[in-house]
């Protein structure tokens, strides 16, 4: 391409923001969950996953942890360039931890909230197994244990799917309505642990002072 030609690329559709969270933050969440899991509520009936251990953890997260998540959701709004950042604010909803083992999986689904039609969901990787097992076929394009986002555009000039094998500390934020799935894995008894946090995006005039922290 000639240096005289200026190129810009514009994309439409959903925005996914990835952050890399520090090990101290990951360790803090893992430690409090391991110590106090007995106090958590089974959340599996509220979720799409075919996963035995899915626990609501709102009460395990202290104000510092919640504040960090709040800042991450604000960063999403800032990075996305959406005009909503001027008129709306993120308000934390429910958080839960999935301990996923071999043979379990999460069917394609999206998130919602009883409080808002507009919102962000997320997934933070807390633990990953050393292996996801042998691929049945085509090992050069692995799927075992992978997280996949599925966009709304399916034509040949669009990127319609994004399949990822994240590492511990990776934190993905995306709209409630973005369809996503997690493939099963095998060959290990180690856990694949993630935390998901829903966050409503509501008009600033509706946010009470205590929710504005």
Predicted regions, residues:
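Non-heme Fe(II)/2-oxoglutarate
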Residues: 1-89, 98, 103-107
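Generic detector of short, locally flexible boundary/turn motifs and exposed helical patches
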Residues: 58-62, 83-91, 136-140, 158-165
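Terminal (often C-terminal
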Residues: 94-95
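Catalytic core of non-heme Fe(II) oxygenases with the double-stranded beta-helix
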Residues: 98-173, 183, 189-191, 195, ...
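Short leucine-rich amphipathic alpha-helical surface patches
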Residues: 173-176, 199
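Short, charged beta-turn/beta-strand-edge "cap" motif at the junction between a beta-strand
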Residues: 177-181
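Double-stranded beta-helix
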Residues: 196-213
């Amino acid at each position: 391409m000639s240096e005289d030609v200026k190129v810009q690329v514009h994309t439409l559709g959903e925005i996914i923001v990835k952050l890399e969270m520090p090990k101290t933050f990951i360790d803090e969440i893992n430690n409090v969950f391991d110590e106090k899991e007995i106090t958590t509520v089974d959340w599996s009936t509220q979720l799409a996953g075919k996963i035995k251990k899915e626990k609501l953890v709102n009460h395990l997260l202290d104000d510092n942890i919640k504040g960090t998540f709040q800042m991450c959701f604000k960063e999403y709004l800032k990075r996305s360039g959406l005009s909503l950042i001027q008129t709306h604010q993120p308000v934390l909803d429910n958080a839960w931890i999935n301990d996923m083992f071999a043979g379990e999986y999460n069917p394609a689904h999206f998130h919602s909230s009883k409080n808002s039609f507009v919102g962000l969901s997320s997934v933070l990787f807390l633990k990953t197994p050393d292996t996801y097992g042998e691929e049945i076929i085509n090992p050069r394009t692995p799927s075992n244990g992978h997280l996949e986002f599925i966009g709304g555009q399916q034509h040949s000039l669009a990127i319609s799917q994004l399949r990822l094998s994240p590492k511990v500390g990776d934190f993905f934020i995306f709209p409630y309505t973005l369809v996503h799935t997690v493939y099963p894995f095998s060959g290990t008894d180690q856990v694949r642990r993630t935390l998901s946090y829903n966050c409503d995006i509501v008009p600033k005039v509706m946010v009470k002072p205590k929710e504005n922290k």
